[in-house]
From Swiss-Prot:
Pfam (any one): PEPCK_N
GO terms under cellular component: cytosol
GO biological process, one term: propionate catabolic process
Binding-site residues, substrate: 77, 216-218, 267, 382-384
Protein name per its UniProtKB record: Phosphoenolpyruvate carboxykinase [GTP]
Lineage of producing organism: Bacteria, Pseudomonadati, Pseudomonadota, Gammaproteobacteria, Moraxellales
The protein's required cofactors: Mn(2+)
Lineage top rank: taxon: Bacteria
């Protein structure tokens, strides 16, 4: 039997008993209680270098930075192996995979039995959100992966201080993770242990997360998507708040007015770039600051405003396509202390990925550890960097404010080659919820499967909602109604809701909108709409700006180009709105009536209004 030996700073009997229970099941060779110290971090890094899991990069060019290359079978989230095991199948809904919790527990008990043999179990305490914030929640992850332990130190508030907040009886979300590769005595380990069989399982009622077989970020860093979205969305519904797949940014104009915006885009649609946007020429005196690039927890305040925190402490960003032109702030964030995964490396120990430079360096080693062959990808399309958010030059002064920051507007956007205009404002909260509920995006490399097909991704939460999607829509509608009453009483108003699409293409298939820093022009219009300053034209699908309503100083983007990405085609929109029925039918009886009514009204407006 493995000895638990909890250190003095752990004073929580229930937690200690749980660690003992999991140790008896998984049978690790030893248990290590992580304290989050620099010494511990370096020791685990050195251990992984010795094991071949990580390599030290050129310390002049990449001080404190390391590279891990995963097994080629373990490179992305595995949505088809991700389960919501609610007691009642209906509570998981048609967009989630469900298994009876009793059946799943039996299955997982079999898989986890002895799964950590020959390995160390790391007890990783973490807070999602600033320590002690009323919006924050604590998790404890038990993992046999040192890669997870060091990554969690960057991605969450990880360490001894968590136990001070937890005390002797504080609540925590129990997270169990194994790579599913036990070692027999004397057996040599591989560089990236994993198992062909993978399960990422959530039990919403008991707030448990169990992950088997994968060492990759989203499947193994259980504070991220598993706790911060799937479990937290269930908690939010019960407690009256939102857990969302959203970036949060602050915008300050030259007059010193500041607004915070939360924006939801599916994975690999530019959340990190937008969160770290640098205003273009013509926007001197404007400032964009970053609160978060991926997840927002949003709670109603007493004044009827919605306040958001970034529950994470780091960025787990997609490397390919990131460079000093597309995201200078991100590149500056990567100046030191980064864990890279599945990027390529030069012969002098510098990282490289597609899009970092036009020229492909000579003598490159690809993400599989082999010499790079021209015409093949040197870095995996879903290669990642893990870095502390505090290193970002555009980080907002209030990014760790335990009270959160007040949200003025929500933006929703997907990757669409046609139909959806550059920007539109919803008529009201219900209309905005409808647009977010039916947003579509072309699939990307962040999830396993086919690329380039339009799929409905409601609120960019399709892979992340921890309960029935129809109930999730209902929660948004109800929250809006409740907060609206409170806001009016305090002289405030609900955030406005906008849709954007940076990805319209011309007849030749090229992107028309330059994107990146130029998205500031759309952002300025959005803020001015929140302030009641900007003009717009009412169309059947919302309020849209004319060419003259946007600020074009410092650019030569023409009216003809603008018309290409804002024109609305009646037939395309009829097809679009009719195609929403497929999602609505899938969601069945629980779909809020207000959304069916909105669809009918929108279809009528589009048929007669264009």
């Amino acid at each position: 039997m493995t000895t638990v030996n909890a250190p003095e700073f752990v004073r929580h009997p229930k937690l200690i008993a749980w660690v003992e229970e999991i140790a008896n099941l998984t049978k690790p060779a030893k248990i290590e209680w992580c304290d989050g110290s620099e010494e511990e971090y370096q020791r685990l890094i050195d251990l992984m270098i010795a094991n071949g899991t990580m390599q030290k990069l050129n310390q002049e060019k990449h001080p404190g930075s390391y590279l891990a290359n995963s097994d080629p079978s373990d490179v992305a989230r595995v949505e088809d192996r991700t389960y919501i095991c609610s007691q009642n199948k209906e509570d998981a809904g048609a967009t989630n995979n469900w298994e009876d919790p009793a059946v799943m527990r039996e299955k997982l008990n079999g898989l986890f039995e002895g799964s950590m043999k020959g390995r160390t179990m790391y007890v990783v305490p973490f807070s999602m959100g600033p320590l002690g914030s009323h919006i924050a929640h604590i998790g404890i992850e038990l993992t046999d992966s040192p890669y997870v332990a060091v990554s969690m130190r960057k991605m969450a508030r990880m360490g001894k201080a968590v136990y001070d907040v937890l005390g002797t009886d504080g609540e925590f979300v129990p997270c169990v993770h194994t790579v599913g590769a036990p070692l027999a005595e004397g057996q040599k380990d591989v560089a990236w242990p994993c198992n062909p069989e993978k399960y990422i399982v959530h039990y919403p009622e008991t707030r448990e997360i169990w992950s088997f077989g994968s060492g990759y970020g989203g499947n193994a860093l259980l504070g991220k998507k598993c706790l911060a979205l799937r479990i937290a969305s269930v908690m939010g519904r019960e407690q009256g708040w939102l857990a969302e797949h959203m970036l949060i940014l602050g915008v300050t104009n030259p007059q010193g007015e500041k607004h915070y915006i939360a924006a939801a885009f599916p994975s690999a649609c530019g959340k990190t770039n937008f969160a770290m946007l640098i205003p273009p020429a013509g926007y001197e005196g404007w400032k964009i600051e970053t609160v978060g690039d991926d997840i927002a927890w949003i709670k109603p305040g007493e004044d009827g405003r919605l306040y958001a925190i970034n529950p994470e402490a780091g960025f787990f960003g997609v490397a390919p396509g990131t460079n000093t032109k597309t995201n200078p702030n991100c590149m500056a964030t990567l100046h030191k202390d980064v864990i890279y995964t599945n990027v390529a490396v030069t012969d002098d120990g510098q990282v490289w990925w597609e899009g970092l430079s036009k020229e492909v360096p000579a003598n490159l080693t690809n993400w599989k550890g082999q010499p790079h062959v021209n015409g093949e990808k040197a870095a995996h399309p879903n290669a990642r960097f893990t870095v502390a958010a505090g290193q970002c030059p555009s980080i907002d002064a209030d990014w760790e404010n335990p009270a959160g920051v007040p949200i003025s507007a929500f933006i929703f956007g997907g990757r669409r080659a046609d139909t959806v205009p550059l920007v539109s404002e919803a008529f009201d909260w219900v209309d905005g919820v409808y647009k977010a509920a039916t947003m579509g995006s072309e699939t990307t490399a962040a999830a396993v499967g086919q690329q380039g097909i339009v799929r409905r991704d409601p609120f960019a939460m399709l892979p992340f909602a921890g309960y029935n999607m129809a109930d999730y829509f209902d929660h948004w509608l109800n929250l809006g109604a409740k907060v609206s009453e409170k806001a009016e009483a305090s002289g405030n108003k609900l955030p406005k809701i906008f849709n954007v699409n940076w990805f319209r293409r011309d007849a030749e298939g090229n992107f028309v909108w330059p994107g990146f820093g130029q998205n500031m022009r759309v952002l300025e219009w959005i803020i001015d709409r929140c302030e009641g300053r900007a003009n717009a034209v009412e169309t059947p699908i919302g309020f849209v700006p004319t060419y003259e309503d946007l600020n074009w100083e410092g650019t030569e983007f023409t009216k003809e180009q603008f018309d290409l990405i804002t024109n609305q085609d009646r037939d395309q929109w009829v097809t679009e709105i009719e195609s929403h029925t497929e999602l609505f039918n899938k969601l069945g009886e629980r779909l809020p009536k207000a959304l069916k009514e909105r669809q009918a009204a929108l279809l009528e407006a589009v048929k007669t209004g264009f």
